């Protein structure tokens, strides 16, 4: 029958998928780094599903253990659960930030609600929490050292903050809220990324006045990449946007670029995020109140060094007054220059970078464009390596390993005695599937399995000015 043929084909496809999914096998790569040359978007959802099933079994084993709850059979067992889920999640989240595509976005929309529900199933489980609480209540009499005691307190606090003390009706509402909150960042981030990628400012040769040769070169290569001949293109990515705002003499074009950046996902945009922001605020506030906090800010800061929103505002206010006074002084200096160029004009946000650079040149004889050749990315990276070696004795050796994008470079990190410390990925340049900003993350966290140290695999991700055919990547003092 046709249904039998379908079942046989489906079964074959599933077996093939299992056989080909890199997350279902040990990674035979240098130091066990992710096999990016084999990982594909369709691998993640099955990997998440298997990883969640494995952790569910690990949690069930803790719950069904008939021995008296102890640090080893409850706290340590819980802490060691979910390693596969962590591994898949670290790789997935990194790729969704640094090299996303439509297939990954679709996988993320499917995975996030499943992961949120899985997390709630664990953190709101009464049997598991009762065992954790039993150890927590007896922590002072179990002969634990300071590290073990801290782990008990952290895990107990994590469950309480997640809603373990709520009644069944409250827990059900919390699950609904968490499910909705799981999808909102995905939708919000996708909109920002698409709005950023959709905008291009096309320039003619008459609109290049003031732009250094390196900035023109990047704009020219971007235009060629987009198939635009005899043109120059500026995008909303920081390495393209900020140099244009800094050097372009075309005030109307600076305004156009600045407003395009600020108005992303705003009213009238195809990717309007305003309703999502309202949903964020409403759901977070309801969650905080459900958990016994007066606001979401109070909920977040309660687990941080600040402790309360009031402490955060106290610090901000200490900085705000002198910072505002200094900003007004700088604006007055820049406005004086603006009046020379455009008498009667009002100083606008898109004037800030341009006139700040003019003030630096006029007052301090500092010119970023002149200084940049001294800060090629290669020189800065080698300088950082040299400093790390002088301070800590560690060295960095190029490593041939799979990468998720051709722009990435990989290094093995060695201790002073030559032993392996970890692997470091660099991903320096902007591209259409990459979030803005800079961050450090891990593909594998450092941990210990018994006495064996599992070395970390770390990535440093930036959005520096990319090289052109004629010039290397040049950084600024900032």
Where are the regions a protein language model picked out?
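Short, small-residue-biased leader/transition segments that mark boundaries at the very start
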Residues: 1-6
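N-terminal helix-rich structural modules
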Residues: 17-212, 217-219
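Short His/Asp/Glu-rich catalytic/ion-coordination signatures at enzyme active sites or charged loops
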Residues: 28-43, 92-111, 134-176, 235-275, ...
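Active-site-proximal, well-structured secondary-structure segments within enzyme catalytic domains
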Residues: 151, 183, 190, 194-235, ...
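Short pre-active-site segment immediately N-terminal to the catalytic Zn-binding motif
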Residues: 465-478
């Amino acid at each position: 029958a046709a249904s039998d043929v379908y079942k046989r084909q489906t079964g074959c496809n599933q077996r093939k998928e299992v056989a080909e999914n890199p997350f279902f096998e040990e990674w035979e790569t240098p130091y066990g780094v992710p096999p990016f040359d084999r990982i594909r978007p369709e691998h993640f959802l099955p990997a998440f599903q298997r990883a969640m099933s494995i952790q569910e079994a690990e949690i069930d084993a803790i719950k069904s253990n008939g021995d008296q709850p102890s640090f080893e059979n409850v706290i340590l067992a819980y802490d060691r659960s979910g390693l596969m889920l962590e591994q898949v999640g670290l790789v997935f989240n990194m790729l969704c930030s640094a090299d996303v595509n439509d297939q990954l976005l679709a996988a993320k929309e499917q995975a996030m609600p499943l992961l949120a529900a899985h997390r709630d199933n664990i953190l709101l489980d009464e049997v598991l929490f009762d065992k954790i609480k039993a150890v927590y209540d007896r922590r002072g009499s179990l002969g634990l050292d300071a590290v073990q005691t801290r782990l008990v307190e952290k895990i107990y606090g994590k469950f309480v903050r997640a809603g373990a003390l709520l009644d069944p009706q409250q827990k059900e509402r919390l699950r609904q809220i968490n499910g909705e909150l799981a999808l909102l960042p995905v939708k919000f981030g996708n909109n920002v990324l698409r709005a950023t990628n959709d905008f291009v400012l096309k320039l003619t040769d008459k609109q290049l006045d003031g732009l250094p040769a390196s900035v023109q070169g990047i704009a020219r290569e971007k235009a060629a990449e987009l198939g635009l001949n005899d043109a120059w293109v500026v995008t909303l990515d920081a390495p393209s946007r900020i140099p244009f705002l800094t050097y372009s003499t075309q005030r109307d074009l600076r305004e156009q670029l600045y407003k395009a950046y600020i108005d992303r996902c705003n009213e009238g945009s195809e990717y309007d995020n305003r309703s999502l922001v309202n949903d964020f605020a409403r759901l977070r506030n309801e969650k905080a109140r459900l958990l016994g906090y007066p606001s979401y800010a109070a909920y977040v800061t309660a687990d941080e060094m600040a402790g309360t929103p009031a402490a955060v505002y106290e610090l901000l206010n200490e900085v705000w007054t002198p910072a505002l006074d200094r900003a007004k002084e700088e604006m007055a200096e820049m406005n004086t220059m603006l009046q020379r160029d455009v008498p009667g004009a009002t100083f606008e946000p898109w004037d800030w970078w341009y006139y700040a650079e003019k003030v630096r040149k006029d007052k301090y004889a500092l010119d970023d464009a002149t200084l940049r050749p001294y800060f090629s990315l290669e020189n800065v990276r080698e300088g950082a390596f040299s400093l790390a070696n002088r301070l800590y004795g560690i060295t960095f050796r190029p490593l041939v390993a799979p990468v998720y994008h051709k722009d990435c470079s990989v290094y093995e990190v060695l201790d002073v005695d030559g032993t392996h410390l970890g692997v470091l990925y660099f991903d320096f340049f902007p591209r259409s599937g990459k979030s803005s900003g800079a961050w450090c993350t891990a593909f594998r966290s450092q941990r210990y399995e018994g006495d064996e140290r599992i070395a970390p695999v770390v990535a440093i991700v930036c959005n520096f000015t990319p090289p052109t055919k004629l010039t290397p990547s040049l950084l600024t003092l900032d």
